[in-house]
Amino acid sequence: MINNDGHRLAFHVTPGHLPAIVLDAGGGLDSSYWKDLVPKIAAATGSEIITYDRAGLGDSDEVPGPWKVESAVGDLETGLRALRVTRNVILVSHSQAGEVAAYFTRGNRQLVSGAVLVDASLPELYTDEEIARLVAANKPQVDAAKADPSTKENRQLIATAENYAPMHQAYHQVSWPDSVPATVIVSEKTPFDGSPEDAQLWRDAAAAFAKAGPDRTLITAVGSSHDIPIERPDLVLSEIEKMATARG
C-alpha cells in the first residue's frame, strides 16, 4: 500500500526490466481486471508490470467528493515515485483510464515512452452536444445509485457523475504530446452498443485522435465489445509487446 494525501492506494508489481508497463483499468474496475493478462505480458516482454487500484476501487481507500482526474494523476505519480520508476514507462489504459493517461502523459513527457490506449476515452469525443447526450443517457443509472449509496460501486458512479460535464468540457481541449507514441485499439461495438450514433462518434474520436499526431496507430478490434482485454487478450498482448520492443 502506498500513501498519498491521506489515503492508501494498492499497487501490485511483477518484477522485470524496463520499460515498465503500467496497466490501468476502466471506470468502476480495479487491478483484478488484468489478472489473466499480467503473467502473459510478463512472460512475453520480461518487463516490470505494475497494476493498481484507483482511489475508491479494489483495495484502495475511498476519497469523498467528485472524481477528479487531476487527483487520479497525482495518485499514479506518487505510486510510481514510491516504486522508484523514474523513466521509460508504457501506459496501457482502458476506457476511463484513457483520461488519466492523457493528463498524466502531458505532465510527465520524460517519464512516458509510449502508450497502448485500449478502447480509451479520448478528448475528441467530448463535444458539448455529446456531453449533454451522455449526461442525459446516464441520468437514470445515476439517480438509482443516489437512491442507494450504500455500495462502493454506487458511490463511485455518483462521484464520477458529479463533475462529469465541466470535467469533460476541459478534457475536450487536451492534446496528446507529439513526442509520445500511442497505439489506439478501438472496439467495433464500443461502450455504446445500443446506440449506433454514439458508437460511431466513439469510433470517429479514436480515428481523429490517431490522425492528430505522429507515431500513432489505429487498430480496430473487429467483433469486440468494450471489454477488449477480456475478449481479445491476444490483440492487446501483441500491441503491448510491439510497443515494449520499440521502446526497450
Residue map of PLM features:
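Conserved HGGG/HGGXW glycine-rich cap/lid loop of the alpha/beta-hydrolase fold
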Residues: 5-59
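Conserved catalytic-core motifs of eukaryotic protein kinase domains, centered on the activation segment
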Residues: 34-35, 60-66, 127-128
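Active-site loop/oxyanion-hole signature of alpha/beta-hydrolase fold enzymes
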Residues: 45-92, 135
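Alpha/beta-hydrolase-fold catalytic nucleophile elbow
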Residues: 53, 118-119, 185
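Conserved hydrolase catalytic core segment
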Residues: 87-124
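Flexible "cap/lid" loop of the alpha/beta hydrolase fold
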Residues: 115-150, 157, 204
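Conserved serine/cysteine hydrolase catalytic core
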Residues: 144-224
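Catalytic active-site module of serine/aspartate enzymes centered on a nucleophile-bearing elbow/loop
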Residues: 214-248
